[in-house]
Amino acid sequence: MDQQEPSNNVDTSSILSDDGMETQEQSSFVTATIDLTVDDYDETEIQEILDNGKAEEGTDEDSDLVEGILNANSDVQALLDAPSEQVAQALNSFFGNESEQEAVAAQRRVDAEKTAKDEAELKQQEEAEDLIIEDSIVKTDEEKQAVRRLKINEFLSWFTRLLPEQFKNFEFTNPNYLTESISDSPVVNVDKCKEIVKSFKESESLEGLSQKYELIDEDVLVAAICIGVLDTNNEEDVDFNVLCDDRIDDWSIEKCVTFLDYPNTGLNSKNGPLRFMQFTVTSPASAILMLTLIRLREEGHPCRLDFDSNPTDDLLLNFDQVEFSNNIIDTAVKYWDDQKENGAQDKIGRELNDFFHEIESTSAEFKQHFENAVGSRNEIIQLVNEKIPDFDGTEAAVNESFTSDQRTEIINSRAIMETLKAEMKLAIAEAQKVYDTKTDFEKFFVLTVGDFCLARANPSDDAELTYAIVQDRVDAMTYKVKFIDTSQIRECNIRDLAMTTQGMYDPSLNTFGDVGLRVACRQVISSSQFGKKTIWLTGTAAGRRRAHRSDFLIFFDNGTDAYVSAPTMPGEPGYEVASEKKSVFSLKEMIAKMNAAQIAIMVGQPVGKEGNLDYFLTFHWIRQSHRSAYIRDFMKEFPEWPLLKMPVGMRICLYNSLVDRRKKMVTVIGTDRAFAIVRHEAPNPLAPGNRCTDFPCNDRNHQHIDEKIYRGSHRLEGAAHKKHMISTNNNLSQRRKDQLQSQFEPTDMIRSMPERNHQQVVKKKTTGTNQNVASTNDAKSKREIEIRKKNQFLFNKIIVPIPVLTPLENLKAHAQCGPDCLQKMDADPYEARFHRNSPIHTPLLCGWRRIMYTMSTGKKRGAVKKNIIYFSPCGAALHQISDVSEYIHVTRSLLTIDCFSFDARIDTATYITVDDKYLKVADFSLGTEGIPIPLVNSVDNDEPPSLEYSKRRFQYNDQVDISSVSRDFCSGCSCDGDCSDASKCECQQLSIEAMKRLPHNLQFDGHDELVPHYQNRLLSSKVISGLYECNDQCSCHRKSCYNRVVQNNIKYPMHIFKTAQSGWGVRALTDIPQSTFICTYVGAILTDDLADELRNADQYFADLDLKDTVELEKGREDHETDFGYGGDESDYDDEEGSDGDSGDDVMNKMVKRQDSSESGEETKRLTRQKRKQSKKSGKGGSVEKDDTTPRDSMEKDNIESKDEPVFNWDKYFEPFPLYVIDAKQRGNLGRFLNHSCDPNVHVQHVMYDTHDLRLPWVAFFTRKYVKAGDELTWDYQYTQDQTATTQLTCHCGAENCTGRLLKS
């Protein structure tokens, strides 16, 4: 057993402390085996060995391996007679005597106390130097990188100028070592260093280079190579693996980076070069080598280095050396005493002697039995020859011995016997055929005792596989293997075992197929900042090789997907090595073989009834439920599994994993067959390259996190649910299905986004032709477009003045406020004089004061916090919105709660105006909105859009029945005030109860529970289950009610303006707080059937299908809710449980699902299109049976139907139509809101004039703070007909603009 390297445990806190240069005394231990060979020593020599005690420290005797075997020889007696004290003394010579152990333990206690003290002092120092530490905290990544590079250059400059003798004896005890240990020039001339680098590059070895260039030792040689590499930025591309061997590892690199990033380190600080070497446990040459590696990596120069992971390192670093040595000594002494008590004859010797005696006696007995058997055989042969004489007339003798009847019977019996033999042979042949057919595949995947294999001790799909040797086959599902790295023997299931004797190169797989095949793949991952590690992970082959340019598409069990290249045919790289056949492989040869093969075949495979690979059963072999469900769905659709189109520049949300539903925004920067390469957003928006989309990115200063994602993965937000909505029966219209389908279908050409509100363009918008509807824009030069963009922003900002009020200090304080406190300045916020200012500015025109206070936080230099305090007309200070609410209540003010905002970003005084020459219409709403809606055009001379303005929605024609829009279809609340307490308002409780019926994950935004009602007339988050406002049935006060928002008039001033490229838009004329109501979207109410008939004029359609909205949101938030992922059920074959009830538990009325095994029919929702077809064929009320394959039927027979309640939307509304809003000919301000990839407005469904779930109002709320002059936009989520061959480009101008309006 080789001597182990000393383990050095360095306390970071003690090294980085500011006082003291001492380091911990480092202890070492030597593992050795006491091996006294009696044949080589006589009794006297053995006694001398025991008497010698401890050898002199530092001699070669400490590292010698003393070998010996305790046998049954009589000479052992002398050894056994030795007292145990001498034995302990001898053992202590290897592990250190008791006094040394006590000293080490004492020193450790002292060090622990010192460490605690140092940490306390360091904490005090950090508090005293708070500004210094804050500077390091607030630095950007770019600034931190610059500081790190400066430190690296300083340390390299010092280390490379060390005197040659200092490289060998580097214990700097001189306090002036920083100046006295170095020279003015590098230790080796730079030109000479370059020559050394070239020689090293050619030989790839350090051997002989020190003598060739007359260097004192190898450490100076390493330093010279680093100097040469740094001077040329490693143009030679030196392989650092040879240099780092036995010098540094990834642990050293990590320690080095930690030291450099520490704020109080540097060449001239207390934590200088000496502390650096102590902290990283390195010599000067190794320090130069580490700093060189980090500098090359920081600057993006070539740096070839792969650290091999060594699990022994961590084990050695964690050893308690004293405890380890004491345990060995105690065990050895105990064994010594036990042997003496048992007598002189050693137990092992006795057992060996007994064993050999048994062998000898058994051999003699066996020999005698064999001789007796041979003799008996010879006697029997001789007896047969004597008793049975030979004669030729056999048939004649038979004929003479039997009568005619007996002969006939014998002949018949022989005929029957021959017939039976023939039938038996035929049956055996048929049975053999069946056996061969069913077991060829199984025989292919069988391990043999003694074979190498890949196995995992931890039965988890995420765990990696390591090399092992087969010990025994326990049963058909279990093998006993011995792991090579740990020598453990364990029983492993065949789903955790992979073969090394077979691979993808085997011709037999051409017969079995590879789709659904369970495999283990070799993957190289990053194990540290500078190292890589090779592991084997299990997965499923998911695509035919020819469909992916000769690569295998692998779905790994841990949730990732990748292409894996593996040789399958002669001539391909690695084929000869991978396919080599030998009776015996060494471990090294086997590793080389598997590295070439890249893919190993798992022992456990999905075998069907016919004995072949059945990929429909693959999901049974995957333990993780989410991954198993995904594989199940994929194999059912194979090869028709759809891929989401992900063009470069597209932005999409990506889930962390199938289990972790947290989302991150990513940008598509490239594609690779069925994969898209996406770039994650940097946590710091100011980081270098945050908006870079180059792939590959060659800017060394950019820090990117790129990932390859399978375009059919359920980690892509909405992809699984959209595909599910298309492929299953639901209540989506064919028009909506076509829109969803287009996201998975190819498109041919791209066209510009039309001017959505331009009268001439409307007719051409969705015809599906190749005509370029924006040809006029295309014809314009870039200069003209730039001019249009500039003219678009020709507006003025004015400041709305406030009246002069009595100074606050002159107002008298009083205990109780009342109506008189309003100073007769109170007014209705809807008065005409407030139309040209922000509603939040209105209180300031009524005697209120809104004062911003800026205060220092005291945590960081320059960090401030801005607070808003309102002062009422009587001088009362109101610090929060609840104070304002109470004041309005007690004073009975006409001002409403939404006229107040504590958002410090809001500038209440700014108002946007335009020159009179650009004003086309003073009030486009013709007075219907209660506030003027001007229309302006500073871009061109186009006439105002042709639209009949309407504030309320209306029925399209007499065929549309909207009789449910009535107070008779509403329930009201019993509140007698302003409904400010949601817990007491029955209408707000309806909203809360509707939210509670949603799946649990849709009730939260991250870790925050969503609030399903207004808060002070603000909507903090979108409520997909819908909001219930108070209505005509309620007894609350209409104007002051906190739950009446959408039904009120527009409050914030806006105007319609002509944009440069997107037609007419809507601009905010004042600052608008987040969560504020903007306006509604109104138009003609159409039935869904009418909408399908008008599908070519659907550019102004808005679906009122609340259930559809909920289902799509479920798909975006957590698609496994729809598929049954993540539940407690283990029966993944439950087709009805997976598809039949998705999204139907939203509403209150519940029905029970029928048991398909009893009724013989499956309860399936009909699409509106199929319902219409059924009615035409006379089957309007019937329920269609779903087409199932024999496999589906077989699997369903084994599944118990679960009796769970769901709300059946279609049964509830089946006699009644669903509705769509069309604002093409007649509408309101909401019709002019344009699309944006980064919208500041979102849509909310609200019910107040009816509680008919089919007829909610469509309302717009701000999703973030809007500045005066900003355009109000929302995300259309617009998709085109699947038969269309064009795409619309987007000109929203957002930083994250995908460039596409139609998402194909």
UniProtKB/Swiss-Prot annotation:
<feature type="binding site">
    <location>
        <position position="973"/>
    </location>
    <ligand>
        <name>Zn(2+) 1</name>
    </ligand>
</feature>
<feature type="binding site">
    <location>
        <position position="979"/>
    </location>
    <ligand>
        <name>Zn(2+) 1</name>
    </ligand>
</feature>
<feature type="binding site">
    <location>
        <position position="1036"/>
    </location>
    <ligand>
        <name>Zn(2+) 3</name>
    </ligand>
</feature>
<keyword id="KW-0862">Zinc</keyword>
<dbReference type="GO" id="GO:0046975">
    <property type="term" value="F:histone H3K36 methyltransferase activity"/>
</dbReference>
<keyword id="KW-0158">Chromosome</keyword>
<keyword id="KW-0963">Cytoplasm</keyword>
<feature type="binding site">
    <location>
        <position position="1100"/>
    </location>
    <ligand>
        <name>S-adenosyl-L-methionine</name>
    </ligand>
</feature>
<keyword id="KW-0221">Differentiation</keyword>
<feature type="binding site">
    <location>
        <position position="1098"/>
    </location>
    <ligand>
        <name>S-adenosyl-L-methionine</name>
    </ligand>
</feature>
<keyword id="KW-0539">Nucleus</keyword>
<dbReference type="GO" id="GO:0072325">
    <property type="term" value="P:vulval cell fate commitment"/>
</dbReference>
<dbReference type="InterPro" id="IPR001739">
    <property type="entry name" value="Methyl_CpG_DNA-bd"/>
</dbReference>
<keyword id="KW-0479">Metal-binding</keyword>
<dbReference type="GO" id="GO:0007548">
    <property type="term" value="P:sex differentiation"/>
</dbReference>
<keyword id="KW-0489">Methyltransferase</keyword>
<dbReference type="InterPro" id="IPR007728">
    <property type="entry name" value="Pre-SET_dom"/>
</dbReference>
<feature type="compositionally biased region" description="Polar residues">
    <location>
        <begin position="1"/>
        <end position="16"/>
    </location>
</feature>
<dbReference type="InterPro" id="IPR047232">
    <property type="entry name" value="SETDB1/2-like_MBD"/>
</dbReference>
<dbReference type="GO" id="GO:0005634">
    <property type="term" value="C:nucleus"/>
</dbReference>
<keyword id="KW-0949">S-adenosyl-L-methionine</keyword>
<feature type="domain" description="SET">
    <location>
        <begin position="1052"/>
        <end position="1277"/>
    </location>
</feature>
<feature type="binding site">
    <location>
        <position position="1237"/>
    </location>
    <ligand>
        <name>Zn(2+) 4</name>
    </ligand>
</feature>
<dbReference type="GO" id="GO:0032259">
    <property type="term" value="P:methylation"/>
</dbReference>
<keyword id="KW-0677">Repeat</keyword>
<feature type="compositionally biased region" description="Basic and acidic residues">
    <location>
        <begin position="1113"/>
        <end position="1122"/>
    </location>
</feature>
<dbReference type="GO" id="GO:0010629">
    <property type="term" value="P:negative regulation of gene expression"/>
</dbReference>
<feature type="binding site">
    <location>
        <position position="1231"/>
    </location>
    <ligand>
        <name>S-adenosyl-L-methionine</name>
    </ligand>
</feature>
<dbReference type="GO" id="GO:0005694">
    <property type="term" value="C:chromosome"/>
</dbReference>
<dbReference type="GO" id="GO:0051321">
    <property type="term" value="P:meiotic cell cycle"/>
</dbReference>
<dbReference type="Pfam" id="PF05033">
    <property type="entry name" value="Pre-SET"/>
</dbReference>
<feature type="coiled-coil region">
    <location>
        <begin position="97"/>
        <end position="129"/>
    </location>
</feature>
<comment type="function">
    <text>Histone methyltransferase which is required for the mono- and dimethylation of 'Lys-9' of histone H3. This increases the efficiency of set-25-mediated trimethylation of histone H3 'Lys-9'. Involved in the transcriptional repression of lin-3 which is required for the negative regulation of vulval cell fate specification during postembryonic development.</text>
</comment>
<feature type="binding site">
    <location>
        <position position="985"/>
    </location>
    <ligand>
        <name>Zn(2+) 1</name>
    </ligand>
</feature>
<feature type="binding site">
    <location>
        <position position="973"/>
    </location>
    <ligand>
        <name>Zn(2+) 2</name>
    </ligand>
</feature>
<feature type="binding site">
    <location>
        <position position="1041"/>
    </location>
    <ligand>
        <name>Zn(2+) 3</name>
    </ligand>
</feature>
<dbReference type="GO" id="GO:0140947">
    <property type="term" value="F:histone H3K9me2 methyltransferase activity"/>
</dbReference>
<feature type="domain" description="MBD">
    <location>
        <begin position="834"/>
        <end position="909"/>
    </location>
</feature>
<dbReference type="InterPro" id="IPR051516">
    <property type="entry name" value="SETDB_methyltransferase"/>
</dbReference>
<dbReference type="Pfam" id="PF00856">
    <property type="entry name" value="SET"/>
</dbReference>
<feature type="binding site">
    <location>
        <position position="1290"/>
    </location>
    <ligand>
        <name>Zn(2+) 4</name>
    </ligand>
</feature>
<dbReference type="GO" id="GO:0005737">
    <property type="term" value="C:cytoplasm"/>
</dbReference>
